Amino acid sequence: MQTGNEHGARAGAGQDAPLRLSLALSRVSQPDDPYAFQFAAQTYLVRAGDSGLAAAEWTWDQELLSDLETLRLRPWEIEPPQRVGERLRRFLAGTGWALEEHKLLEAVHRRQPVILTVSSTAAELYALPWELVSHRATGQHIGELPDVVLRYEWPDTQTIRERPVERGRILLAWSAAGGAVPAADHIAAIAGACSATQYPFDRDRDVLAHVSCESLVAALHEADARRSPISVLHLLCHGAAVGPTFGLALSSNSPDETVTVVDGPRLRQLLAPFASTLQLVVISACDGGNIGALGNQLGSVAQALHRAGLRSVLASRFPLSITGARKLAQELYGALLLRHETLEAAVVSVRDRLARSARQLDWLALQLSARAADGDVTRPLFVRPFRGLQPFRPEYRWAFFGRDVEIAELHAQILGLIDRREPRFVVVAGATGVGKTSLIQAGLVPALRAEPSPRWRTLELRPGASPIAEFTAAVAGLT
């Protein structure tokens, strides 16, 4: 076990730092070849936390493949999750997992967040949903426990060094080439969360309809050229089979075809040049995290991006229901923007929301690819809440605290002047640096804009040597 040394996963919740657990796996036979899979019983080496290596045997048989396919296509069947969970528990029983499990359960009991990193040099083990590891006594899966998140890491990879961008943009790119998608719902979810926090999101600029490989790269290049790069890429489309694995059904620029199925290596080639600013890729598509046929060397779309150095990729290892995709967008951006949660905590929030559906396994489909070396406090939407000597402006209303009384007084004074038909002139005076500008810009202005009837327009000007002339010119611009 490694102890986290950063802040707790839920920002502002006052919780302890997350408990960091790890599960590292490798194949005994041909350990240097990730794809040397054999459809038979195989021996693997398991290291749980700081425990020593222990050998464990896993049997790949038709019953297991049938259960995995049932999880993917018939999520309403109730026995396969328990069978797979029990298999995973028995596989780990003779290793150091018992101690890690004990630590995990103690952390859950005291409501401490837990982050379990699963890594494997054997590619086939990523086909297993480790969230289903069950507890012998309770039968509960570790993935259903409160405040527990799993992240999947490919060993010996590194995240491309981040180029920090304050208030980096969100780009929603969607394609209906593979069938209709609920684009309007996803746009509304992102736009609503951004609007509530004054986070920049322009439906004309930040929504890329009928996305193709060419238009996606062009949009990313244009954002970089304008010095407003994309921090979060939200891809909404259908998944589709491609060779032995799965890809994304994007629109085609070719007159001879309407659909281009983009596999992981191809998407990796497109997005890798932007890895220093792309902090999160959300793949809202069926099988975006599905590695496909066991032993194939392509892997999943999410895994390809992760291995190339992108910091965080959130995808679905199974088909994602339309309702589940909608809930994912609503909860994810609500958590990141409205509640200012870390990505790790936001994934827990999304999973909990998805788990409320009795006939779907969307909660189990959700898969986060990230590296333990990057820490436990991932914030893909970087917002600096402290302005230093700079004043708080309206877009920073969410981070402006401690002036509620003064804001209410100013608001009441202005409304009182209007009601009494008196000159509508209010002076705010004070010593330099006490926050006069912030009080107006991040306090009063948002309060006026929040009124039910949108009757207010605001102007900002400097009086200069001729204040009347400056004021007259500014007001003239309103007509």
Describe these PLM feature segments.
Residues 1-138, 145, 164:
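Non-catalytic, solvent-exposed interaction/assembly segments
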Residues 6, 18-45, 347-352, 360-404, ...:
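Charged, amphipathic alpha-helical interface modules that flank catalytic cores or transmembrane segments
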Residues 19-21, 168-173, 457-459:
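Conserved beta-strand elements of the Class I
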Residues 55-58, 344, 348, 374-479:
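Amphipathic helix/helix-loop-helix segment enriched in hydrophobic residues with interspersed Lys/Arg
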Residues 121, 157-258, 283, 296:
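A domain-level signal for caspase-like cysteine endopeptidase catalytic cores
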Residues 142-154, 255-276, 334-385:
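Caspase-like cysteine protease fold
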